[in-house]
């Protein structure tokens, strides 16, 4: 995961001081890309421990189309707590847009099912895309989508994915985002009888919060360790039938975790 550490250093070296919605302040760069060959290992940051339970359960929650944090709480995941209302609702965030994008005539489009069908029946299509950025519903969302748009690509029997992330919290959020989409690529590839290819991450406003600087320097002082391997223990009937127990990360030997405040 040297690419990730190099991005951190780039933000420190080249970033512009900017104000932000949270009032915390950031160092920010605009436009950055990283490529991870998923054949080389699972891209889970090793210079600090990442909470894999949260990453897996959040992705399963998205795939169910859920937008209430009750499922997350049942599984001891609290990463969405700060944005939920008193009933645990977040509005039409990722899960709603992925699974039930509303159309003007009252229908709902299941984008995940659509891209699975495309991958199986028209893998050379240049339209194998999922978007969470629904302009008509942004004002109803507790938090506008940060990882907003992703595209799948099939070549030589391998499935690749590129994500566009409009806003990226490099220290806290990005390790989650990379691992989450890498996991999704593995799941989609298994469902489509493909091998995994590359995960390409593209960032817009890519920033370090001003209250994450000490943590960033600590992480940069650490040497990356070998990437772990993802094992999927079974192939469910559909992309929506995976369970937490289906996934195992083998050989994950990270440095200790580093705590940092969340900018809300």
Curated annotation (Swiss-Prot):
One GO cellular component, as annotated: cytosol
Biological process terms from the Gene Ontology for this record are: dTMP biosynthetic process; dTTP biosynthetic process; methylation; regulation of translation; response to radiation
List the NCBIfam families hit by this protein, alphabetically: PRK01827.1-3 (NF002497), PRK01827.1-5 (NF002499), thym_sym (TIGR03284)
- Extract the InterPro entries matched here: Thymidate_synth/dCMP_Mease, Thymidate_synth/dCMP_Mease_dom, Thymidate_synth/dCMP_Mease_sf, Thymidylate_synthase, Thymidylate_synthase_AS
> What function does the entry list?
Catalyzes the reductive methylation of 2'-deoxyuridine-5'-monophosphate (dUMP) to 2'-deoxythymidine-5'-monophosphate (dTMP) while utilizing 5,10-methylenetetrahydrofolate (mTHF) as the methyl donor and reductant in the reaction, yielding dihydrofolate (DHF) as a by-product. This enzymatic reaction provides an intracellular de novo source of dTMP, an essential precursor for DNA biosynthesis. This protein also binds to its mRNA thus repressing its own translation.
Please provide, alphabetically and separated by semicolons, the GO molecular function terms listed in this UniProt record. Answer: magnesium ion binding; protein homodimerization activity; RNA binding; thymidylate synthase activity
Q: Which reaction does it catalyse?
A: dUMP + (6R)-5,10-methylene-5,6,7,8-tetrahydrofolate = 7,8-dihydrofolate + dTMP
Q: How is it modified after translation?
A: Although not discussed in the published references, Met-1 is represented in the submitted PDB entries as being modified by either a formyl, or a carboxyl group. The N-terminal is probably N-(dihydroxymethyl)methionine, the hydrated form of N-formylmethionine.
* Active site feature: 146
Quaternary structure annotation from Swiss-Prot or TrEMBL: Homodimer.
**What's the chief localization of this chain?**
cytoplasm
The record's listing under SUPFAM superfamilies reads: Thymidylate synthase/dCMP hydroxymethylase (SSF55831)
Q: Give the Gene3D superfamilies listed for this entry.
A: Thymidylate synthase/dCMP hydroxymethylase domain
Its name, as the record gives it, is Thymidylate synthase
Question: Can you tell me which residues bind dUMP?
Answer: 21, 126-127, 166-169, 177, 207-209
Chain positions recorded as (6R)-5,10-methylene-5,6,7,8-tetrahydrofolate binding sites:
51, 169, 263
Q: In which pathway does it act?
A: Pyrimidine metabolism; dTTP biosynthesis
EC no.? 2.1.1.45
State where the protein is found. Answer: Cytoplasm
Give the UniProt keywords, A-Z.
Cytoplasm, Formylation, Methyltransferase, Nucleotide biosynthesis, Repressor, RNA-binding, Transferase, Translation regulation
Family, as annotated: Belongs to the thymidylate synthase family. Bacterial-type ThyA subfamily.
């Amino acid at each position: 995961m040297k690419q990730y550490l190099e991005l951190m250093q780039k933000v420190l070296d080249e970033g512009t001081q900017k104000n932000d919605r949270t009032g915390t302040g950031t160092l920010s760069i605009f436009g950055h890309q990283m490529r991870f060959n998923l054949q080389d290992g699972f891209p889970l940051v090793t210079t600090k421990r990442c909470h894999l339970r949260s990453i897996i359960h959040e992705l399963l929650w998205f795939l169910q189309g859920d937008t209430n944090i009750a499922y997350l709480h049942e599984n001891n995941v609290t990463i969405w707590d700060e944005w939920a209302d008193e009933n645990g609702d977040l509005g039409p965030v990722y899960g709603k847009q992925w699974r039930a994008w509303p159309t003007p005539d009252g229908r709902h489009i299941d984008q995940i099912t659509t891209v699975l069908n495309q991958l199986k029946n028209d893998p050379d299509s240049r339209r194998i895309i999922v978007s969470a950025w629904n302009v008509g519903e942004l004002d109803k969302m507790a938090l506008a989508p940060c990882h907003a748009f992703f595209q799948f690509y099939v070549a030589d029997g391998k499935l690749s994915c590129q994500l566009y992330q409009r806003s990226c919290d490099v220290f806290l959020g990005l390790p989650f985002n990379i691992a989450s989409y890498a996991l999704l690529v593995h799941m989609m590839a298994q469902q489509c009888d493909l091998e995994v290819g590359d995960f390409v991450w593209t960032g817009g406003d890519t920033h370090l919060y001003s209250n994450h600087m000490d943590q960033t320097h600590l992480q940069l002082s650490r040497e990356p360790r070998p990437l772990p391997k993802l094992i999927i223990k079974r192939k469910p009937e559909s992309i929506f039938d995976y369970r937490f127990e289906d996934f195992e990360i083998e050989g994950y030997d990270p440095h200790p975790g580093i705590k940092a405040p969340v900018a809300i």
